[in-house]
Amino acid sequence: MAELPTAPNGVSSGDYLHRSIDQLRSLTHLTTADLRTAQLVHDYKPFNINEFRQNVVERLDYSLKNGLVHHQQQQQQQQQQEMLQQQQQHQAHQEQQQQQQQQQQQHHHQQQQHHLKSSYSAPSSPPTPHEQQEQKYDPNRSPQRPLMSSGSNASSPEDDRRGSGGGPGGGGGGDGDQSKPYKCASCSKSFANSSYLSQHTRIHLGIKPYRCEICQRKFTQLSHLQQHIRTHTGDKPYKCRHAGCPKAFSQLSNLQSHSRCHQTDKPFKCNSCYKCFADEMTLLEHIPKHKDSKHLKTHICNLCGKSYTQETYLQKHLQKHAEKAEKQQQRHSSQVAAVQQHVPSGGIGLNLQRQAMNDVNAAYWAKMGADSAAASLAEAIQQQLPQTNGQTYANFATLQQHQQQQQQQQQDMLQQHHQRLADTPGHSHSPHEDPAGEDLVLRQTTPQHHLQQQQQQQQPSPGPGSSAFTPLSATVPPSHLQQHRGAPAATAAYLYQQNAAAAAAAFPTQLISLHQIRNYAHQPGAAGLIAGDHLTLGLSAVQAAKEKAQ
């Protein structure tokens, strides 16, 4: 092997780097010139170990520095992660606090409802038995199912959807008890949720917390209030989807009932629940299901015939009838009060005087006897009776009956008066010989008086329908008018035809004196028929006739 050349400056050969065997082999083939060029190319330099160690230390320091920076970056990342975790924990803690507050509010609300239920007394409608006390719900004890009245078992459609008693899935079976453990203590219904049970118990307790701000009507459930508000706003969100049908409804149940009318494949409809069936046999099988059902309108109004499904609805309807009757009575009393304000304190007597002053006829008094004058006064009193009796007799039928009774009494009194006159010893039965103290009209012996009576007998009497004294036509004629008994049965006893020309000439000699009126008033038969207020009518009529004759 060729020896390696020694390094200059007395440096030992161990201080140089040794070449590999291949390099040495390649160097042997090179010339000296080539070696020089190779030395220049490879630039062989002597390497000092101290310098190498120093470089190594610097490299180690650099690596340490790089490691510290990386460690610091990791620490910063960890700190950021910890901060994020703390923020998340803080947010979770806030959410927990909010949930706790909500739970506390719910618990407080439930306590208030429980306090209201415990302190609330059940109203009269729906009716509940007096001997049974209110029972509160306790899930630990077995439910008691007392027999309640029909009004207390009232339930809403939502209660029927949430739970039903006695049927499949209700409170009567074993599977229903497991799926719906919350049972009502007042009825046989059961529910799957306690909130549904609390809403249902409001029906039995009569609690209606939801009030309409427009009409102040109260409801047990919020959904019922929302449906009721649509009646005020006119909102109808449920529209019929049938082609060409523009109808819309405020409630879904009404739309469902309406949609059945478009079903052509099911022509047989149930009148109780509006369900439709394809054949008649299925409908006949369905109808018995409504027996003892809440759909039947068994509560009927005796006044108008309307029927309702619940007794409470019938009571509200009857209350409307009572309010209407009260309003009619108030209106009638106000009308009577208005009439009384226009009538003076004289009452009926003054009204009779006004009527006599306006309608007096001189010939009428000239041809009247005592009986006809009394009959005219009685008829005038009868004409004024509806004004006075209208205050006390609100019913027209009773008023008419009362008037008939008074007419009958007056007729009886007239008959008694005529009988007394007939039984008088000095009484004459001739129509031309009247005593001076008996009648209101003076005794007439003039030829004009006989002429008038002959004309009255010759003139045909009108029918009973045209007479002003129809109520007295059926009475027995008095004893001093026996000449009329030969007349036909249709003629009246007190019918006179007026002759204005003869009466106007004969009237001044036929005036009534005041002492004769007083004597007539003091007679035993006439005192009960004509009062002192009505006797003033004759005097006022006489004065008016005098003025007219002058």
Curated annotation (Swiss-Prot):
PTM sites of type Phosphothreonine: 424
Compositionally biased residues, Low complexity: 73-105, 400-416, 444-460
Record-listed Phosphoserine modification sites: 428, 430
Regions of compositional bias (Gly residues) in chain numbering: 164-176
Keywords annotated in UniProt: Developmental protein, Differentiation, Metal-binding, Neurogenesis, Nucleus, Phosphoprotein, Repeat, Transcription, Transcription regulation, Zinc, Zinc-finger
A molecular function (GO) term: zinc ion binding
Sequence ranges of Basic residues compositional bias: 106-117
PROSITE patterns in the record: ZINC_FINGER_C2H2_1 (PS00028), ZINC_FINGER_C2H2_2 (PS50157)
Superkingdom classification of source: Eukaryota
Keyword Transcription: yes
SMART domains, sorted: ZnF_C2H2
Composition-biased stretches (Polar residues): 141-156
Pfam entry (one): zf-C2H2
Compartments where found: Nucleus
Signal peptide: none
Matching Gene3D superfamilies: Classic Zinc Finger
Residue span of region Disordered: 73-179, 399-485
Span of zinc fingers (C2H2-type): 182-204, 210-232, 238-262, 268-290, 299-321
GO CC list: nucleus
GO biological process, one term: cell differentiation
Assembly behavior: Interacts with nab; which acts as a coactivator. Interacts with ap.
Listed PANTHER family: GASTRULA ZINC FINGER PROTEIN XLCGF49.1-LIKE-RELATED (PTHR47772:SF13), ZINC FINGER PROTEIN 200 (PTHR47772)
Family membership: Belongs to the krueppel C2H2-type zinc-finger protein family.
Official protein name in the record: Zinc finger protein squeeze
Gene: sqz
